[in-house]
Amino acid sequence: MNCAISGEVPEEPVVSKKSGLLYEKRLIQTHISDYGKCPVTGEPHTLDDIVPIKTGKIVKPKPLHTASIPGLLGTFQTEWDSLMLSNFALEQQLHTARQELSHALYQHDAACRVIARLKKERDESRQLLAEAERQLPAAPEVATSNAALSNGKRGIDDGEQGPNAKKMRLGISAEVITELTDCNAALSQQRKKRQIPKTLASVDALEKFTQLSSHPLHKTNKPGIFSMDILHSKDVIATGGIDTTAVLFDRPSGQILSTLTGHSKKVTSIKFVGDTDLVLTASSDKTVRIWGCSEDGNYTSRHTLKDHSAEVRAVTVHATNKYFVSASLDSTWCFYDLSSGLCLAQVTDASENDVNYTAAAFHPDGLILGTGTAQSIVKIWDVKSQANVAKFGGHNGEITSISFSENGYFLATAALDGVRLWDLRKLKNFRTFDFPDANSVEFDHSGSYLGIAASDIRVFQAASVKAEWNPIKTLPDLSGTGKATSVKFGLDSKYIAVGSMDRNLRIFGLPDDDNTEDSAQDS
C-alpha cells in the first residue's frame, strides 16, 4: 500500500473515512490544515476524518525497490540520468547566453563606430560650411517673386519658401571669376605658342589602324558602354555603363583597376579631373558623384550631389580642375566647387523654360560653356555671368555630344541627324556630315583629328573652314549592335578607344610591327 500523495510506503499510515484513500499522516495533516479538503477527490476534510492504521512496531516496512541491490542501482541510475540531463540543459543555456552577449557586444561596437563616423562627418560639414560663409561675398538683392533672374540664375518661386524650399546658391564669387579669367589668359597665351607634337600619329598611321583588343568590362545582363574618358598621363580608360557601374581600366596591363558602384541607374557621363585621382560620374538616377582613390587603391564616393530633379546627362571639368558643370533634363546646369561639392550656381535660361540639357562641354580656355538640348539647340554660355550669349540651330533631333577643338574656334556637335561643325568666330555652321544617329563626336588633344561614333566609327583630318575635311579611316562596329556610343583618342592619337552597346571596350591602333616602324620614323 502506498501513500496517495507521495507514492511511497507510509511510515505512519492513515486512511480517509470519506474516500478510503491511504496517506502518510504528516502529509495529509499538512494538506488538510492548508486547504481543508482531500487532495485527490477534493471533498471537504477535517483531521477527524482520518483514521490511523496500526502496524507492527518491531519491524518497519521498507520500500520494495530499495530492498535489494538491483533496486538501489536502478534508483542511482535514475538520479544520475536526471543529473546529467539537468547539467546538459544548463550548458545549453550557458552557450546561448554567451552567444547573445557576444552579439550584443558586436552591436554596441558597431553603433559606437557609426556614431563616431557621423560625428566626424558632421564636424567636417560644419567646417566646410564655415569656410564657405567666410568666402561668401555680400549678396545682392534678389527679387524673390521672379522665377529666374536676368543673369540666368534660378530665382525663388513663392511656392519654394519654407523648410522644403530649394537651397539658396552661393553664387560665383568675384574671387572665382578672377581665377577663371586668369586661367583663360594663361591658356590663351599657351595656345598661341603651342606646336603640333612630333609624336602625334600620322595620317598614314591612322589609315592602318585595326582592332588590337577587346575587353568585357560591364555586366552581360545590362550591356552597353554609354560614356568614356581617358586619363592620358596614366593611360587609364574610364567607362560608364548601362549596368549602373563605372569601370577604371589600365590599358597597358589590360587589367581593371576599380569598379565604381553606387548609382542606381545607368551612368550617362564620366570624366577624369585633370591628372588627379578624382573621377566624376553623372547618372539617370538624378545624381552626380565625386569619386576619390583611397590608400588601398579602391575608389570610393566622396560626394553624392542631388541638386538636379531629373536625369543628369553630362559632366564637364573646368581647365582649373577646381570646378565642374553638370547638365540635366530638368532644364538647368549647375556650377560646382570640386573640393567641397557645393553647387555655387544653378542656371536656367530665362527665355526658355522647357529646355532639356543633354550634353555639355567647357571651351579649352574655360570662360565659355557649350550645352546641347533635346530640342535640337546648341547654346553657348558666358560662365562669368551665366548668360546665354549664342544659340546654334539646324540640327534635327536631340543633341547627343559636343566637343571643342583645342585651336579654340571650332565646335563639333552630334545629333540624331548627323554632325555639324561651327566656327565660333562667326557663329556659323561651315560643314555638315550626314551620319544618322551620331552618338559621340570628339576632337583629339592636338585638334588635328575628329572622331565620330554612329553606326560605325569615322575619323577625319581636321582642316580650315574652307578646306575639305578628308576622311582618314572607317572603323567597323564589331559589337554587332550597330551602335557605337563613344569614341576617344589616346595620347598623341596612338590609339582610339571605342564603346558600344555591348559590354566591351575596344582598342584600335597600329599592329605591333607597324607601330615599331612608325615610332622609328618619328624618332
From Swiss-Prot:
Start-end of each WD repeat: 220-261, 262-301, 307-346, 352-391, 394-432, 434-470, 479-518
EC number: 2.3.2.-
CDD domains in the cross-refs: RING-Ubox_PRP19 (cd16656), WD40 (cd00200)
Compartment(s): Nucleus
Catalytic EC class: transferase
Any one Gene Ontology BP term: mRNA splicing, via spliceosome
One matching Pfam family: Prp19
UniProt family annotation: Belongs to the WD repeat PRP19 family.
UniProt-recorded name of the protein: Pre-mRNA-processing factor 19 homolog 1
Species of origin: Arabidopsis thaliana
Gene name as annotated: PRP19A
